[in-house]
Amino acid sequence: MRSNLALSALVLLAACGGSGPTVLENEAKDAATAATMQGWDRAFGAPRETIGRVNQFGYRATDYAADGPTFLAKGGPITLSQSDAKAPNTGTFEAAGATAAKIDRLVFTLSLTDAANAETAKKRFVEVLRGFLSQYGIDDEGGFGAITSEQSADGPIGGAPASIDVTKGADGRPIITVTFNRPTGTTPVFPDQGQADGNRA
């Protein structure tokens, strides 16, 4: 009986020794990979780190993980103005991509549901965006002025294709969606924010 137990123990040890890398080992590998990149290459090419940096602004985004044919991470809503308003202005975040290794699209959305505090919300939204981009040494060079004026705009920001879309939600209130695209991104679907208000395919 003892020899059988000993044999079983050896089998278990062998099985444990043959297991794949641990979570900590994967995180260390991701961090090492991220350290070799900079700018947008790092923002799109290091999903785990990017989600962590987004979460510094309170979005509490989920892990970047498989969701049907794509990979998604979703965060928010976060309150961007008077929290005790009947319907505070809020922001949400999504990252989408075709593979686990890279993000193809970063989407930040501001829903203006409290007109009385809309200017404050837009200002804070811009601060969040600039704070996020500053971690990668990226400057919008005034491009986010379209947010405060509630004007749709398209053009590169730091070399990456970007768009600011101002649409109306089901209740007629403004929704400002800022999208940053990886130049070679191939995500086959748009994140949910655009679909929710019926303004995207």
Regions found by a protein language model. Give the residues of each.
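Sec-dependent bacterial lipoprotein signal peptides
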Residues: 1-14
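Bacterial signal peptide processing site
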Residues: 16-20
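Post-signal peptide N-terminal segment of mature Sec-exported envelope proteins
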Residues: 23-49
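A cross-family detector of function-defining hotspots
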Residues: 52-96, 134-169
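Short beta-strand micro-motifs in enzyme catalytic cores
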Residues: 76-81, 104, 174-176
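Short, surface-exposed beta-strand/loop "edge" segments at domain boundaries and coil↔beta transitions
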Residues: 79-81, 86-90, 114-119, 182-193
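Long, charged/polar, surface-exposed segments that mediate recognition or autoinhibition
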Residues: 90-149
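Polybasic, proline/glycine-rich intrinsically disordered low-complexity segments
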Residues: 148-201
